[in-house]
Amino acid sequence: MIRASLKSLLARRVRLLLSTFAIVLGVAFVTGILMFSDTVQRSFVALFDSTVGDSVVRPVNSDVAQQGAVFSTQTVPASLQPDLERLPGAARVDGMVSATGVYVLSTGGKVVGGSGPPAFGGNWNDAPAGHGLEGLVILDGHEPHGADEVVLDESTADRAGYELGDKVSIVTATQTLDVHPTLVGIAGFREGGSLNGATYAAFDTPTAQQLFLDGKDAYTVFWVTARDGVSQEELTEQVAAALPEGYEAVTGDDAAEESAGPLLSGIGFLTTFLLIFAGIALVVSSYIIVNTFSILVAQRSRELALLRALGASKKQVIRSVQLEAFAVGLVGSTLGLGLGVVLAMGIRALVSSIGLDLAHQPLILAPRTVLAAFATGIVVTMVAAWLPARRTGRIAPVQALRDDVALPESSVRRRLLLGVALLAAGIPLALVGLFVGAVPHNGWWVGAGVLAVLLGVTAASPVIGRPFLRATGAVEARAFGPMGRLAGQNSLRNPRRTTATASALMIGLTLAFTVAILGSSAKASVDKAVEDNFIGDYVVSSAFGEGFSPAITDRMAEIDGVTEVLRQRYGFGLLGGDEDDGLSIVATAPETIGDFHLKAVAGSVSDFADDTVLLKEDWADDHDLGVGDTLEVTLPTGAKKWRVVGVVEDSPLVFSPVLTTTQTLLDSGFPDQDNYVVVFADPGATGLQERLDAVVEDLPVVTVKDQQAFAAEQRAPIDRIIGIIYGLLFFAVVIAVLGIVNTLALSVIERTREIGLLRAIGVSRRQLRQMIRLESVVIAVLGAVLGVALGIVFGVTLMYALRDQGLERISIPVVQLVVFLVLSLVLGVLAAVFPARRAARLDVLRAIAAD
């Protein structure tokens, strides 16, 4: 049986080519994603390990601000350094000055990076990293000396177009440097690697202290390097014992883990997100495999019947088909692994082009990736091939020797019953999630219901699709005559095969149109929210979320035509000191609280003052807080207790559940910077946009936007996310189109004698090609119609489920619906090119004689 299976496999290797290619694409997707994820994780772990000392001295609670991606003004005084240097376990102590939001402008005046990875500034230091690792070193040039010299990391200098000796333009959200320092050094890691897209500008220590610490003789942190034989834990114990109250020491490993933790969690989420789409691609691939082996098994029914008649058992026949599937999966997995490496290189290049510079990072091919590639490809192939293999074993040998072997009707009935059962379970699940408020995790109920409905429609598609196939066949017969009639009859000849092929396309288009509705509705909801809640006439903010100098707001307030400015500032704390319960905070001046138009449901907005807070109603209810209670929160300066003076209705004008005063936030260790400013204009003011822009013309990271520009800025991330998802779904659609090509190509082989007879009675090559194209169009249109219908239902359902998240307006993009349907027709025609050409080129006599 093994020899027979291998001979059968070699004899039909061309027929298995497209199925193998489908597995190749699915496995490549999985491999590429896992390789990229491992590469990113390894690079960031190595980066953070190289940017901490053996022991790190910092202000207590300084990590609170870091968790919220905000800047703290807390520092460690330089006077601590001599005491630390006298410790028996300390080899050296280095003071580090570090600040975020320090942007390098390119030679063309554009900000380098900043759209994702941070932009750092600080003092140059050649201290070794923890465990003796080498940190940044000067690769070319020399260290900076004086206020007119700067060192840039290698990637930043390259992206900005600077060479040694050039004058460098550097800005922050608060100021443009008065001097244009000369680039005197290029820094990097001697053993390769990079800052992964972050930018770094280093000055000498006095200059960095003047620029980033207001001239204080202090540092952001100290790095303490351990002597030989002293562990990080031993050194940190010595350091902690020597520190006064208000400062703490942590091991370099712990500091690196704190910095890398949130980022690695995000990478883990991204990996899971991408693997979901890889799973979709593999599911679509499985449809192709089921169809391929169903057709091949049907073509080999006589051969397998003879084997049964010669003594082969039912299990042996099934195992022979499974052996062929194993071989297909093995070849597909091997090729997919190789293509996955290429795909990972492409992902790395794409990500590097948008800011996360990984071009210098070697790709990581971990053993688990290789195992996942082969396990995924082989298991998916063998599971998909098991159904037709099992079906073969159910047909009696004598029956299989006949020419008219047919699938038992009981199989179709079972699929219908399964489909009805899934629909009967899925619809109530979705309804419970949508309308029963007491049920926890409503979104999971809706998601489970949607998935069950999708699987139910797929299972019942042979029955659901029959009326559509008949109707389409009638239309084609009327429009294209005999060839249209034949195409319709061929589609109905094996409705399960036709609908299975269409289901692969249906899944891709269902997801694509669901995403289209979610994206269109999200943008419509954003527009509505901006339209309903945009107060004032202009908003001022940093393009990268950094704070900016209040002097900018002061200058704008003095412009003729500006009647008022409303400032907001952002902070971050830990609720009750719990590291897992972060809390974002918004602050404004008490005298401007009326401009927020907040509606109190308890207490009074007029009681808003320093060391008090207003809470949003839903958040207050969730945390059992009310007027008169105390909100305990840990901030960079320590634990604080704020009195709750009001509970207000939800308002999109306040970007946090907690609102306090500007002075309260300033006293909590956050910088004196505005984050978001609303400008109110005199109704008769003209040319105000230009005058506001003039205030920030030297600060390209701070922008002034009217309502229309602000709405466009809010929509931009949605467009980017939708574009990424479409790109990921493209793989599934490509595989589905390959499925149509595969089914038609195998169908042509299966119907070789029939095609020969058609040619013998006068059907021309052109008519034959037309017939195959029409069959392909039927499959594509069926998949598109089901996909669009389900996409609309799922999209509207999910939007309704997300109504409490601010997505209040449902928008169905009709133009995209039409485009999807037209593209389906085009894909159907293109998918038929190869099979139709093959059918038209068959030799008539050989085709008639074919068995």
Annotate each language-model stretch with its function.
Residues 11, 15-17, 269-272, 368, ...:
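Alpha-helical transmembrane segments, especially those used as permease/efflux helices
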Residues 25-36, 281-285, 289, 331, ...:
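Hydrophobic alpha-helical membrane-associated segments
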Residues 3, 8, 12-29, 37, ...:
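Hydrophobic alpha-helical bundles that form the membrane domains of multi-pass transporters
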Residues 27-58, 63, 294, 344-352, ...:
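Alpha-helical transmembrane segments
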Residues 326-357, 369-394, 423-436, 463-473, ...:
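Small-residue-rich transmembrane alpha-helices
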Residues 447, 451, 457, 463-619, ...:
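Juxtamembrane segments of multi-pass membrane proteins
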Residues 2-6, 11-286, 295, 530-532, ...:
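Membrane transport/envelope proteins' first extracytoplasmic loop
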